[in-house]
UniProtKB/Swiss-Prot annotation:
InterPro entries named in the record: bHLH_dom (IPR011598), HLH_DNA-bd_sf (IPR036638), MASH1/Ascl1a-like (IPR015660)
GO MF term list: DNA-binding transcription factor activity, RNA polymerase II-specific; protein dimerization activity; RNA polymerase II transcription regulatory region sequence-specific DNA binding; sequence-specific DNA binding
Subcellular location: Nucleus
Organism encoding this protein: Danio rerio (Zebrafish)
Highest classification ranks of the organism: Eukaryota, Metazoa, Chordata, Craniata, Vertebrata
Reported phenotype of the disruption mutant: In pituitary absent (pia) mutants, adenohypophyseal cells fail to express hormone genes and some become apoptotic.
Protein name: Achaete-scute homolog 1a
Assembly with partners or alone: Efficient DNA binding requires dimerization with another bHLH protein.
Keyword line: Developmental protein, Differentiation, DNA-binding, Neurogenesis, Nucleus, Transcription, Transcription regulation
Biased composition range(s): Polar residues: 33-44, 159-176
Ranges where the bHLH domain occurs: 78-130
Gene that encodes it: ascl1a
């Protein structure tokens, strides 16, 4: 093939190809201000139009490599749909996790729905309070085991504890005899467990 024939083919290909760069103008319709619009809104519209006027004409590059045997990789719609579905499922699981957490933390059953941040803060406070309760329980148990405290509580106090509505009473408190009355701190901790 001769060089002039190649040039004719490339000229013919250029006739069928869209231009590499073209100018796109935004159509802006100016309308007279209505009687309902104030002068302030008209001046805002004018400022908006002036600020966007440099963008009225801009070069948009459209390159078509199809005639040269090249193609740009296109995102597969199926892959995008699967990715979006995975993200929706992930968000749903996170939201379900927060809903479950709201049910287990104090103030979670209140009328006002707690935000995610409030739920996390409440869970942290709840865990700290439970940890403190366990630490104090371990300290009391260690004191009983070392013999510092003697298990002598009056039967009246045990009966009072059993008669309190909604208060958690251990099964061994009435079965195994009497113990010393609880200190105000220990009583407060028992009251704390009634919140839940």
């Amino acid at each position: 093939m001769d060089i002039t024939a190649k040039m004719e083919i490339s000229v013919n290909q250029q006739q069928f190809m869209p231009p590499a760069c073209f100018f796109a103008s935004q159509s802006i319709q100016l309308s007279p201000t209505d009687s309902q619009c104030s002068n302030k809104s008209a001046s805002k519209q004018a400022k908006r139009q002036r600020s966007s006027s440099p963008e009225l004409l801009r070069c948009k590059r459209r390159l078509n490599f199809a005639g040269f045997g090249y193609s740009l990789p296109q995102q597969q719609p199926h892959a995008v749909a699967r990715r979006n579905e995975r993200e929706r499922n992930r968000v749903k699981l996170v939201n379900n996790g927060f809903a479950t957490l709201r049910e287990h933390v104090p103030n979670g059953a209140a009328n006002k729905k707690m935000s995610k941040v409030e739920t996390l803060r409440s869970a942290v406070e709840y865990i700290r309070a439970l940890q403190q309760l366990l630490d104090e329980h371990d300290a009391v148990s260690a004191a009983f085991q070392s013999g510092v405290l003697s298990p002598t509580i009056s039967q009246n106090y045990s009966n009072d504890m059993n008669s309190m509505a909604g208060s958690p009473v251990s099964s061994y408190s009435s079965d195994e005899g009497s113990y010393d009355p609880l200190s105000p701190e220990e009583q407060e901790l028992l009251d704390f467990t009634n919140w839940f």
